C-alpha cells in the first residue's frame, strides 16, 4: 500500500488544519480513509457523542497518489490519535505546502512535511512522523459514513459568523440550546434557565428543494420541528471556520438529531449532534 499527497493552496491548508482541530475535539481516535478520488476524516467517537464526517475530493490536492490493499479493494484506512494530527498541522497556516505520506519508520507512520519559507528562495521543512495503525479490511465497515434516515425538516443556515456569535452568547447562559426550524425558511434558537429565556429568530432562510416537496404531502409549512442539544457541542461545529461554505444546511430529526452539512467547493463537512 502506498499513499502520497500534497496541498499547496493556502485556503485548503487552512481548512485541513481546521478539520484536524475539530476532529481532535470530538474524538481521541481518527481514521483517515484514503480512496482513489478523495480523503475521508472518520472520527471514532463513542456512541451518543457528537460526530464529524469530513470529505476532501482529490482536486483539493496538488498531488495525490495512492495504491490500496488490492485492485479490488483499492482503499487504505489509517487509524491514528486525533490530537497528534491536530498538533502536527497546527502551525502550518503559513506553509507553502503540506505533504502527507504513508511511510515505514520501524512501524507504519503518516509522515507530514510542513514546508515553510525561511528566506527568499529558500524553504525549511518541519517533519512529523505520526504512528498509525493500518486497519485490516474486516475493520473497514467501522469507517463508513454515518447513516441518517430522512430528516423531518431541512433549512439553509444563516451566516455562520452570526450563528456562532449567537451560540457563544447562549453558551454563557445555559448548557443546552433548543433548535427549531420549519418548511417556511424559519429557524429559532432558544436557551432557557430558571431566571432568563433568550430566543433568536431567523427568517427567509429558504429550504432545499427536496424539503419543499413535503409541503405537497399535506404538511403545514409553519409547523416547527425541534431538537435540544448540548451548547458546547454545537459551538464546536462553528469553531475556527475561516472559509465560508458555499452551502450550509441544517437538518433536524425531531427530538433525536441535529445534522449540519457544510460544503465548500471540493470539501464537505457533516456534523451529527444527538439530542440531549
UniProtKB/Swiss-Prot annotation:
<dbReference type="InterPro" id="IPR007150">
    <property type="entry name" value="Hus1/Mec3"/>
</dbReference>
<dbReference type="GO" id="GO:0030896">
    <property type="term" value="C:checkpoint clamp complex"/>
</dbReference>
<protein>
    <recommendedName>
        <fullName>Checkpoint protein HUS1B</fullName>
    </recommendedName>
</protein>
<dbReference type="Pfam" id="PF04005">
    <property type="entry name" value="Hus1"/>
</dbReference>
<comment type="subunit">
    <text>Interacts with RAD1 and RAD9B.</text>
</comment>
<dbReference type="InterPro" id="IPR016580">
    <property type="entry name" value="Cell_cycle_HUS1"/>
</dbReference>
<comment type="similarity">
    <text>Belongs to the HUS1 family.</text>
</comment>
<dbReference type="GO" id="GO:0005730">
    <property type="term" value="C:nucleolus"/>
</dbReference>
<dbReference type="GO" id="GO:0000077">
    <property type="term" value="P:DNA damage checkpoint signaling"/>
</dbReference>
Amino acid at each position: 500500500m502506498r499513499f502520497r499527497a500534497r496541498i499547496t493552496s493556502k485556503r485548503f491548508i487552512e481548512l485541513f488544519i481546521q478539520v484536524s482541530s475539530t476532529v481532535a475535539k470530538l474524538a481521541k481516535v481518527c481514521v483517515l480513509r484514503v480512496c482513489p478520488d478523495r480523503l475521508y476524516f472518520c472520527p471514532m467517537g463513542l456512541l451518543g457523542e457528537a460526530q464529524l464526517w469530513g470529505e476532501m475530493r482529490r482536486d483539493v490536492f496538488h498531488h495525490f497518489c495512492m495504491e490500496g490493499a488490492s485492485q479490488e479493494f483499492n482503499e487504505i484506512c489509517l487509524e491514528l490519535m486525533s490530537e497528534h494530527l491536530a498538533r502536527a498541522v497546527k502551525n502550518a497556516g503559513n506553509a507553502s505546502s503540506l505533504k502527507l505520506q504513508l511511510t515505514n519508520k520501524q512501524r507504519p507512520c503518516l509522515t507530514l512535511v510542513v514546508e515553510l519559507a525561511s528566506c527568499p528562495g529558500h524553504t525549511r521543512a518541519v517533519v512529523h512522523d505520526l504512528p498509525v495503525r493500518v486497519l485490516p479490511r474486516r475493520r473497514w465497515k467501522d469507517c463508513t459514513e454515518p447513516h441518517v434516515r430522512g430528516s423531518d425538516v431541512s433549512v439553509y443556515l444563516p451566516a455562520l459568523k452570526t450563528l456562532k456569535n449567537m451560540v457563544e452568547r447562549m453558551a454563557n447562559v445555559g448548557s443546552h440550546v433548543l433548535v427549531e426550524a420549519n418548511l417556511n425558511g424559519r429557524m429559532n434558537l432558544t436557551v432557557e434557565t430558571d431566571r432568563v429565556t433568550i430566543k433568536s429568530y431567523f427568517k427567509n432562510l429558504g429550504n432545499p428543494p427536496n424539503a419543499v416537496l413535503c409541503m405537497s404531502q399535506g404538511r403545514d409549512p409553519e409547523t416547527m420541528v425541534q431538537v435540544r442539544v448540548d451548547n458546547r457541542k454545537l459551538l464546536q461545529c462553528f469553531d475556527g471556520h475561516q472559509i465560508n461554505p458555499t452551502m450550509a444546511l441544517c437538518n433536524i430529526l425531531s427530538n433525536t438529531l441535529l445534522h449540519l452539512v457544510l460544503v465548500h467547493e471540493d470539501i464537505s463537512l457533516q456534523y451529527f449532534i444527538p439530542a440531549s
